[in-house]
A protein has these predicted regions:
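Short, acidic loop-to-helix structural element flanking the phosphoryl-transfer center
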Residues: 10, 28-53, 61-64, 80-87, ...
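Conserved Lys-Pro-Asp/Glu-containing loop-to-beta segment of HAD-superfamily phosphomonoesterases
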Residues: 193-223
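Acidic, Mg2+-coordinating phosphoryl-transfer loop and its flanking beta/alpha structural elements
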Residues: 216-249
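Short, well-ordered secondary-structure micro-motifs within conserved domains or adaptor modules
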Residues: 124-141
Length: 264
């Protein structure tokens, strides 16, 4: 059964773990401002010499997310940030550096592929593969557009740099790259995912061998599912992406790995 950590807080469990994977969006900030309580948690972890990774499904390199965190008020812990975009970039540089790609997502995400931007094509028919970082700015709300766009190209490779389906930017809910990837799968395509809940991002961002690990996040489909796949304990923040479904709780639920079946 899960434990409610609302009263005792994470500090009551801190000595049970050597490594913490902590989500950023929904835990450290809401897309607009930092949650001060979360900074106290990070400070407490550092004080107790605990290792942690600020692991986020963001389709941008580490450096871009760090710049954003600085802008909204995070004053340190930059070296602990790791993004799904960084994991994607590593794979793309190793496997697709000289292949032509079609970018699905807003122009602001260009920094993910600026090292090989010369391979970007504007004609979808010329692409060897797709890089999906999100939705086009003029097609942010209607997913049907992407079914029409991609239905003839399900044989191409599709790299999804953010498995999240949705995100809340303040009080506004937005679709993410994962929603487009899901459509691509529904029309028969195969997707290469980077980020939570898929195992590679955990191994790329930290040495997890032999360590007791706690994953902290607000998304059941990525943070919690990823922890369960890895057989890690996990802490669900109920005030995040699932706040409407869990509005009556407003607590933190700790699930140990032996309770993972309850969340499957």
């Amino acid at each position: 059964m899960p434990q409610n950590l609302d009263k005792d807080g994470l500090r009551s469990k801190i000595n049970s773990y050597e490594l913490f994977f902590i989500d950023i969006w929904g835990v450290i900030h809401n897309g607009l401002q930092i949650f001060e309580d979360s900074i106290e948690v990070l400070e407490n972890l550092k004080k107790n010499n605990k290792e942690f990774v600020l692991l986020t499904n963001a389709p941008r390199p580490n450096s871009t997310v760090i710049d954003f965190l600085k802008k909204i008020g995070l004053k340190k812990y930059y070296e602990d940030v790791y993004t799904s975009g960084e994991a994607s970039l590593k794979y793309l540089m190793q496997n697709f550096q000289n292949s032509k790609f079609y970018h699905i997502g807003p122009p602001r995400d260009f920094d993910l592929f600026k090292r090989f931007e010369q391979n970007k094509v504007s004609n979808i028919n010329q692409a060897d593969y797709f890089i999906c970082t999100g939705l086009f700015e003029d097609h942010e709300t209607k997913l049907e557009y992407y079914e029409d766009l991609l239905e003839k190209f399900s044989n191409k490779k599709f790299v999804c740099t953010n498995p999240d389906l949705i995100v809340d930017r303040g009080d506004v809910r937005e679709f993410c790259a994962g929603s487009v990837a899901k459509i691509f799968e529904e029309i028969g395509g195969k997707v290469i995912y980077f980020g939570k809940p898929y195992p590679p991002v955990y191994n790329l961002s930290a040495n997890i061998n032999g360590k007791n690990v706690l994953c902290i996040g607000d998304n059941m489909n990525t943070d919690i599912k990823g922890a369960n796949i890895q057989n890690f304990d996990n802490l669900l923040i109920t005030s995040g992406i699932h706040k409407k479904e869990l509005s009556s709780l407003n607590i933190c639920l700790l699930y140990t790995s032996d309770a993972a079946d309850e969340l499957s």
